[in-house]
């Protein structure tokens, strides 16, 4: 993994997955075609109670996030936008939407801005997942959502004319090495992420089956092997601070950080970026179960990158309650499920020799440990 910094600043969600009470609020999403690849989503609160939820990583988010999944001949079209990890408390008011019972809101977006649809032809669009609900600007639960399946015929020429939401960076300019306190913090986070991922890999492959079932909703050997393999791949990537398969920015190269975003990944470029609150808000390692910290945030972002382990994960759910309500197939591809499992898997104590070298290490840069 190369560490750099800018010099200037699915459809089966419900089937067999959930045992929700009949009166549980839900969001119904109706997708319609506006013009070619431009889509309108109408989101309705079908419950009997007012709900306040986080609309970031959802409809009404102005950033190029994954609002829907696109399929051509049953194969998902690669998403070229960003996937980001959000705060779970202290959220700003502009990150929240409140819907009364029966109320709706609409969001229009162009799917060709975050996917290559220049081939044209038939594309199927759908979405499902969970949206975090909040109390006093803190995530307190989740609300499920699901859409209709929309089939559109894409005009290839029109799709090609849609500007891409994210332009590739010119890596020849405005790029320098991490330095100072952020370099030190990220170096520590990478070491901790590698340690947590290694411990989680062992727990996934040969640890408690009850605990694995809690997070991944199955104890099948194939799933345990897949989860362990992804954790080992994350540990390997986090252990290499001067080379690797991803590029890690200490700050935001694209301008998609805000007061609610800890970090984000651009899977199509295997690029990860930390936001300001990654450093100011998160501890290096939390002592609380299922809480956020720098190490598990970095681990979460690594799971999104397909070059680390393919396919990269999605964000079907955030937090323990929502993540443990997923189906087995969704949990296997949910980034926060990996972060939560790793958070609850304490790494083995380091050997005395390792501690000795750490005490002697005064380098704040990115040279390898002895």
Swiss-Prot record:
Q: Which organism is it from?
A: Aspergillus fumigatus (strain ATCC MYA-4609 / CBS 101355 / FGSC A1100 / Af293) (Neosartorya fumigata)
Disulfide connectivity for this sequence is 178-250, 257-275
What protein does this entry describe?
A: Neutral protease 2 homolog AFUA_4G13750
**Similarity-based family:** Belongs to the peptidase M35 family.
Highest taxon of the lineage: Eukaryota
Q: Provide a GO CC annotation, any one.
A: extracellular region
A GO BP annotation:
proteolysis
Q: Which residues form the propeptide in this entry?
A: 20-172
Protein function: Secreted metalloproteinase that allows assimilation of proteinaceous substrates. Shows high activities on basic nuclear substrates such as histone and protamine. May be involved in virulence.
Signal sequence interval, chain numbering: 1-19
Where's it found, cell-wise?
A: Secreted
Q: Where is the active site?
A: 301
Report if keyword Disulfide bond is assigned: yes
Instruction: Alphabetically list the UniProt keywords.
Output: Cleavage on pair of basic residues, Disulfide bond, Hydrolase, Metal-binding, Metalloprotease, Protease, Secreted, Signal, Virulence, Zinc, Zymogen
Which Pfam families does this one have? Peptidase_M35 (PF02102)
Q: Where does Zn(2+) bind?
A: 300, 304, 315
Catalysis: reaction(s) = Preferential cleavage of bonds with hydrophobic residues in P1'. Also 3-Asn-|-Gln-4 and 8-Gly-|-Ser-9 bonds in insulin B chain
**Keyword set includes Lyase:** no
